[in-house]
A protein has these predicted regions:
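Beta-lactamase-like hydrolase cores
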Residues: 25-80, 99-102, 138-143
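Small-residue-rich helix-loop
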Residues: 72-74, 288, 313-463
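Short, well-structured active-site flanking segments
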Residues: 97-112, 274, 379-383
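Coil residues (strongly favoring Ser/Thr
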Residues: 50, 102, 113-114, 123, ...
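A small/polar active-site loop signature that marks catalytic segments
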Residues: 214-381
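Active-site SXXK
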Residues: 69, 83-100, 177, 263-268, ...
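Bacterial Sec-dependent N-terminal signal peptides
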Residues: 1-35
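Mid-domain, small-residue-enriched loop/turn segments at the edges of structured enzyme/sensor domains
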Residues: 58, 107-187, 191-197, 272-273, ...
Length: 463
């Protein structure tokens, strides 16, 4: 009879001890982890939260000391954003890691009286803005027969690129042996005195493919700034603008193996044949070097040249794995695994230019990349590659100061997305790495850029 009261007393004691243990465990529950910099600079957080322009959409801003890496401020730093052309910073890093001091223009070997040559993705062959004549003169002066050898290459367009941008200058097709930047340039000259108006087409071989726009293509939907349009699936160009004033337009052309051979032969003004790339053990394969790499990096970053960024990854892929193809995805996988494994968050990396909306990155990851670039590249060289506020590139009309540039960065724009990542020199002399991302805004992009500048000017003045 005594066992039941004793058993009941035991259960009560055990229950009390468990309640005490639970209460103690509850007291020891760790506080939520606060990201570094999240609680700092309340004036800056208030500036962002109170902005009528920025408040309706998703905004991220991250600041860190570029030299020490000290976190200074962070808002939405762990969320994923579409970075647009900020992805070119990843392409730059890939090039810095994989390419030598000069670009690989082409690979070649000689056998008998024939020079066999193959593209490496070098975009500078007679390019309109970063032209190199090294490969052109090498091929033009080579004795004997020229045999161009094809090589497998990534698709003309990257994953997620908008198909209806095929006719705009900023989306040329990718390729193994680019010529003229894969674009045609049109120069309209208005009538002067007794000289009638005229249209100059470069390369000249495209003049015969250019004509007036048919009535069926003259639709109200054509942009008022459009001068020349191209047929979707062929190299037919139609002029839609009058010649009553001077204008210049640039339109991508369709690429193909046969068209490249014909255009290259016309350009070199000598016979050219296609052939397979089959070097023998006794053949010595060499690489012809072209322009210094910084000439490409500078143009790519300053004016945000998508074509150069895409071709940069194709060139970099010649240093990774076998030499049997040019592959954007191969070099992305390699760089991500070998050099970017320590990034705080994984990167969804789809292309070299940022044209694809499949690219996704967190602000904290972009900040880590900026800090890594500053650590590995001498500061004067690094800043010289980027657009500079008030001076050149995509920032030339913003961030002015009579004393000189104080913002160096890479802009990034897609419809409804406006971004900027780079470096900022404060009035105290401190260099900051920053990422300022704006996604899914319906406000005019100019208004968003104005507000970004207003915020960054406060950062410059107060830090």
């Amino acid at each position: 009879m005594l066992l039941r009261p004793l058993y009941s007393l035991f259960l009560l004691t055990l229950g009390a001890s468990q309640l005490t243990a639970c209460a103690q465990a509850s007291d020891k529950t760790p506080a939520a982890i606060v990201p570094p910099g999240a609680g700092k600079l309340p004036w800056l957080r208030n500036l962002l939260d109170s902005s009528a322009v920025l408040r309706p959409h998703t905004v991220a801003l991250v600041l860190a000391d570029a030299t020490t890496g000290e976190p200074l401020f962070a808002q939405n730093e762990t969320k994923y954003f579409a970075p647009a052309s900020n992805m070119k910073l990843f392409s730059l890093y890939a090039g810095l890691k994989l390419l030598p001091d000069s670009l690989p223009s082409l690979r070649y070997f000689s056998r008998g009286d024939t020079l066999f040559f193959q593209g490496t993705g070098d975009p500078t062959f007679l390019h309109g803005d970063v032209p190199s004549r090294r490969a052109f003169e090498f091929l033009q002066k080579a004795p004997g027969l020229l045999a161009n050898c094809d090589i497998a290459c990534s698709t003309s367009y990257g994953p997620g690129w908008p198909w209806d941008d095929f006719g705009y200058y900023f989306q040329p097709e990718r390729g193994a042996f680019p010529i003229y930047g894969h674009t045609v340039r049109f120069y309209a000259q208005p009538p002067v005195g007794n000289v009638s108006s005229r249209l100059r087409v470069l390369p000249k071989s495209f003049a015969s493919l250019t004509g007036p726009v048919p009535a069926a293509l003259r639709t109200p939907g054509i942009d008022k700034d459009t001068h020349v349009i191209r047929a979707l699936d062929e190299n037919r160009f139609y002029v839609v603008a009058p010649f009553n004033k001077k204008w210049i337009d640039e339109v991508p052309f369709r690429t193909s193996r046969a068209f490249t051979l014909r255009l290259l032969g016309d350009t070199l003004r000598r016979p050219l044949v296609g052939a397979p790339w089959h070097p023998r053990a006794t053949d010595v394969v060499r690489t012809l070097r072209g322009l210094p790499v910084d000439s490409l990096y500078r143009r790519m970053l300053r004016v945000s040249d998508n074509f150069l960024a895409e071709q940069l990854l194709l060139m970099a892929s010649t240093t990774v794995g076998l030499h049997d193809s040019l592959s954007t995805q191969r070099v992305i996988r390699y760089v991500r695994r070998k050099y970017l494994g320590a990034l705080p968050y994984p990167v969804a990396w789809a292309d070299g230019s940022g044209l694809s909306r499949q690219n996704l990155v967190t602000p904290r990851t972009l900040e880590a990349l900026l800090l890594q670039l500053h650590k590995e590249v001498p500061e004067p060289r690094l800043l010289s590659l980027l657009a500079a506020g008030g001076q050149q590139g995509t920032l030339r009309k913003r961030y002015h100061d009579a004393a000189g540039p104080w913002v160096w960065g890479k802009t990034g724009s897609l419809a409804n997305n406006t971004n900027l990542s780079g470096y900022l020199r404060t009035k105290s002399g401190r260099l900051l790495a920053f990422t300022f991302l704006n996604n899914n805004h319906v406000a005019d992009s100019g208004d968003v850029r104005n507000e970004m500048e207003r915020v960054l000017r406060q950062v410059r003045a107060r830090l």
